[in-house]
From Swiss-Prot:
BP term (GO), one: negative regulation of DNA-templated transcription
DNA-binding positions: 27-47
Pfam families: LexA_DNA_bind (PF01726), Peptidase_S24 (PF00717)
Gene of this entry: lexA
Family of the protein in this entry: Belongs to the peptidase S24 family.
Top-rank taxon: Bacteria
Keywords: Autocatalytic cleavage, DNA damage, DNA repair, DNA replication, DNA-binding, Hydrolase, Repressor, SOS response, Transcription, Transcription regulation
A GO CC term attached to the entry: protein-DNA complex
Name assigned to this protein: LexA repressor
Species this chain originates from: Listeria monocytogenes serovar 1/2a (strain ATCC BAA-679 / EGD-e)
Length: 204
Protein backbone atom coordinates (compact mmCIF):
# COMPACT_ATOMS: atom_id res chain seq x y z
CA UNK A 1 0.00 0.00 0.00
CA UNK A 2 1.47 3.32 -1.09
CA UNK A 3 1.35 6.25 1.32
CA UNK A 4 3.34 9.47 1.43
CA UNK A 5 6.39 9.99 3.62
CA UNK A 6 4.39 12.39 5.80
CA UNK A 7 1.56 9.90 6.22
CA UNK A 8 4.06 7.19 7.10
CA UNK A 9 5.60 9.46 9.73
CA UNK A 10 2.16 10.19 11.19
CA UNK A 11 1.21 6.51 11.18
CA UNK A 12 4.46 5.49 12.88
CA UNK A 13 4.09 8.23 15.49
CA UNK A 14 0.54 7.16 16.35
CA UNK A 15 1.65 3.54 16.56
CA UNK A 16 4.59 4.35 18.84
CA UNK A 17 2.43 6.49 21.14
CA UNK A 18 -0.17 3.72 21.45
CA UNK A 19 2.56 1.19 22.25
CA UNK A 20 4.26 3.44 24.81
CA UNK A 21 1.28 5.09 26.51
CA UNK A 22 -1.68 2.88 25.73
CA UNK A 23 -3.67 5.65 24.06
CA UNK A 24 -3.28 7.67 20.84
CA UNK A 25 -1.87 11.20 20.57
CA UNK A 26 -3.95 14.33 20.01
CA UNK A 27 -4.05 16.10 16.65
CA UNK A 28 -1.85 18.83 18.12
CA UNK A 29 0.73 16.30 19.31
CA UNK A 30 0.78 14.65 15.88
CA UNK A 31 1.35 18.02 14.22
CA UNK A 32 4.20 18.89 16.57
CA UNK A 33 5.83 15.49 16.03
CA UNK A 34 5.87 15.69 12.24
CA UNK A 35 6.33 19.44 11.80
CA UNK A 36 2.81 20.46 10.77
CA UNK A 37 1.45 23.67 12.29
CA UNK A 38 -2.02 23.38 10.75
CA UNK A 39 -4.47 21.04 12.46
CA UNK A 40 -6.54 20.92 9.26
CA UNK A 41 -3.51 19.54 7.40
CA UNK A 42 -3.10 16.85 10.07
CA UNK A 43 -6.81 16.01 9.78
CA UNK A 44 -6.35 15.68 6.01
CA UNK A 45 -3.53 13.16 6.42
CA UNK A 46 -5.54 11.24 9.02
CA UNK A 47 -8.48 11.09 6.61
CA UNK A 48 -6.20 9.59 3.94
CA UNK A 49 -4.82 7.03 6.38
CA UNK A 50 -8.37 6.14 7.36
CA UNK A 51 -9.37 5.86 3.71
CA UNK A 52 -6.55 3.38 3.17
CA UNK A 53 -7.70 1.25 6.09
CA UNK A 54 -4.72 1.93 8.34
CA UNK A 55 -6.58 3.74 11.09
CA UNK A 56 -10.13 4.22 12.30
CA UNK A 57 -11.41 7.42 13.92
CA UNK A 58 -14.47 8.29 15.98
CA UNK A 59 -15.30 11.96 15.27
CA UNK A 60 -17.44 12.18 18.41
CA UNK A 61 -14.53 11.47 20.77
CA UNK A 62 -11.15 13.15 21.37
CA UNK A 63 -8.02 11.07 20.77
CA UNK A 64 -10.16 8.30 19.26
CA UNK A 65 -7.67 6.97 16.71
CA UNK A 66 -7.40 3.20 16.40
CA UNK A 67 -4.55 1.49 14.56
CA UNK A 68 -6.08 -1.20 12.35
CA UNK A 69 -2.81 -2.74 11.13
CA UNK A 70 -0.70 -2.72 14.27
CA UNK A 71 2.40 -4.83 13.85
CA UNK A 72 4.09 -6.46 16.79
CA UNK A 73 0.87 -6.44 18.80
CA UNK A 74 2.59 -8.32 21.58
CA UNK A 75 4.53 -5.16 22.35
CA UNK A 76 1.37 -3.11 22.89
CA UNK A 77 0.96 -2.45 26.62
CA UNK A 78 -2.03 -3.85 28.41
CA UNK A 79 -4.56 -1.25 29.47
CA UNK A 80 -6.67 -1.24 32.62
CA UNK A 81 -9.82 0.83 32.84
CA UNK A 82 -9.75 2.73 36.12
CA UNK A 83 -12.78 4.58 37.48
CA UNK A 84 -13.00 8.36 37.36
CA UNK A 85 -14.86 8.89 40.61
CA UNK A 86 -15.58 12.59 40.21
CA UNK A 87 -14.10 15.93 41.15
CA UNK A 88 -11.96 16.74 44.16
CA UNK A 89 -11.00 20.27 44.97
CA UNK A 90 -7.47 21.59 45.10
CA UNK A 91 -8.81 24.76 46.68
CA UNK A 92 -11.57 24.78 49.26
CA UNK A 93 -12.82 21.35 50.38
CA UNK A 94 -15.90 19.96 48.70
CA UNK A 95 -18.09 17.00 49.53
CA UNK A 96 -16.51 13.78 48.27
CA UNK A 97 -18.09 12.28 45.18
CA UNK A 98 -18.33 8.51 45.27
CA UNK A 99 -20.31 7.81 42.12
CA UNK A 100 -18.31 6.55 39.15
CA UNK A 101 -18.68 8.99 36.25
CA UNK A 102 -16.63 7.13 33.64
CA UNK A 103 -13.53 5.00 33.14
CA UNK A 104 -10.08 5.97 31.87
CA UNK A 105 -7.81 3.56 29.92
CA UNK A 106 -4.59 3.59 31.93
CA UNK A 107 -1.50 1.67 30.76
CA UNK A 108 -1.11 -1.29 33.10
CA UNK A 109 2.46 -0.41 34.06
CA UNK A 110 1.26 2.91 35.51
CA UNK A 111 -1.09 1.05 37.83
CA UNK A 112 1.83 -1.15 38.96
CA UNK A 113 -0.42 -4.20 38.85
CA UNK A 114 -2.71 -2.81 41.53
CA UNK A 115 -6.48 -2.85 41.35
CA UNK A 116 -7.09 -0.15 43.97
CA UNK A 117 -6.33 2.79 41.68
CA UNK A 118 -8.78 5.49 40.69
CA UNK A 119 -8.88 8.94 39.13
CA UNK A 120 -10.24 12.23 40.40
CA UNK A 121 -10.57 15.48 38.49
CA UNK A 122 -8.95 18.49 40.14
CA UNK A 123 -11.09 21.59 40.67
CA UNK A 124 -9.03 24.58 41.79
CA UNK A 125 -5.52 26.00 41.71
CA UNK A 126 -4.08 25.38 45.16
CA UNK A 127 -1.64 22.70 43.89
CA UNK A 128 -0.20 24.62 40.94
CA UNK A 129 3.33 24.80 42.41
CA UNK A 130 3.37 20.99 42.36
CA UNK A 131 2.38 21.01 38.69
CA UNK A 132 -1.23 19.95 39.39
CA UNK A 133 -3.54 22.31 37.52
CA UNK A 134 -7.26 22.98 37.47
CA UNK A 135 -8.90 20.32 35.28
CA UNK A 136 -6.10 17.75 35.63
CA UNK A 137 -7.04 14.19 36.48
CA UNK A 138 -4.89 12.77 39.27
CA UNK A 139 -4.16 9.05 39.51
CA UNK A 140 -4.68 7.94 43.11
CA UNK A 141 -3.64 4.70 44.80
CA UNK A 142 -5.95 3.88 47.69
CA UNK A 143 -4.04 4.00 50.95
CA UNK A 144 -5.03 4.89 54.49
CA UNK A 145 -1.71 6.39 55.62
CA UNK A 146 0.89 8.78 54.26
CA UNK A 147 4.39 10.07 54.94
CA UNK A 148 4.96 13.75 55.60
CA UNK A 149 5.31 15.64 52.34
CA UNK A 150 3.34 13.22 50.17
CA UNK A 151 0.48 14.52 48.04
CA UNK A 152 -2.76 12.89 49.11
CA UNK A 153 -6.48 12.97 48.68
CA UNK A 154 -7.80 13.33 52.21
CA UNK A 155 -11.22 13.50 53.82
CA UNK A 156 -12.01 15.54 56.90
CA UNK A 157 -14.44 14.71 59.69
CA UNK A 158 -17.00 16.83 57.82
CA UNK A 159 -16.90 14.29 54.96
CA UNK A 160 -15.17 16.73 52.65
CA UNK A 161 -12.34 15.70 50.31
CA UNK A 162 -9.37 17.72 49.15
CA UNK A 163 -6.03 17.22 47.37
CA UNK A 164 -3.11 18.60 49.37
CA UNK A 165 0.39 17.82 50.65
CA UNK A 166 0.14 15.90 53.94
CA UNK A 167 1.94 16.66 57.21
CA UNK A 168 1.38 15.12 60.63
CA UNK A 169 2.46 17.61 63.29
CA UNK A 170 2.48 17.74 67.10
CA UNK A 171 -1.15 18.61 67.78
CA UNK A 172 -2.81 18.44 64.40
CA UNK A 173 -2.64 17.41 60.77
CA UNK A 174 -1.70 19.99 58.16
CA UNK A 175 -2.97 19.81 54.60
CA UNK A 176 -0.63 22.17 52.80
CA UNK A 177 -1.53 23.76 49.46
CA UNK A 178 1.13 24.25 46.80
CA UNK A 179 0.12 27.85 46.15
CA UNK A 180 1.82 30.70 47.98
CA UNK A 181 -1.41 32.72 48.09
CA UNK A 182 -3.32 30.11 50.12
CA UNK A 183 -3.26 29.07 53.76
CA UNK A 184 -2.92 25.47 54.99
CA UNK A 185 -5.86 23.51 56.38
CA UNK A 186 -5.28 22.45 60.00
CA UNK A 187 -7.31 19.50 61.29
CA UNK A 188 -7.55 17.48 64.46
CA UNK A 189 -8.60 14.42 62.46
CA UNK A 190 -8.13 13.45 58.85
CA UNK A 191 -8.79 10.34 56.77
CA UNK A 192 -6.38 9.52 53.95
CA UNK A 193 -8.21 8.22 50.89
CA UNK A 194 -5.09 7.67 48.82
CA UNK A 195 -1.77 8.94 47.51
CA UNK A 196 -1.44 10.79 44.24
CA UNK A 197 0.90 8.74 42.03
CA UNK A 198 0.44 10.50 38.70
CA UNK A 199 -1.75 12.74 36.61
CA UNK A 200 -3.28 13.04 33.18
CA UNK A 201 -3.67 16.37 31.39
CA UNK A 202 -5.52 17.04 28.17
CA UNK A 203 -3.47 19.72 26.41
CA UNK A 204 -5.85 20.33 23.51
Amino acid sequence: MKISKRQQDIYEFIKSEVKEKGYPPSVREIGEAVGLASSSTVHGHLARLEGKGLIRRDPTKPRAIEILSLEDEAETPNVVNIPIIGKVTAGMPITAIENIDEYFPLPEYMAAGETNVFMLEIDGESMINAGILDGDKVIVRQESSAINGEIVVAMTDENEATCKRFYKEANHFRLQPENDALEPILLNNVTILGKVIGLYRDIR
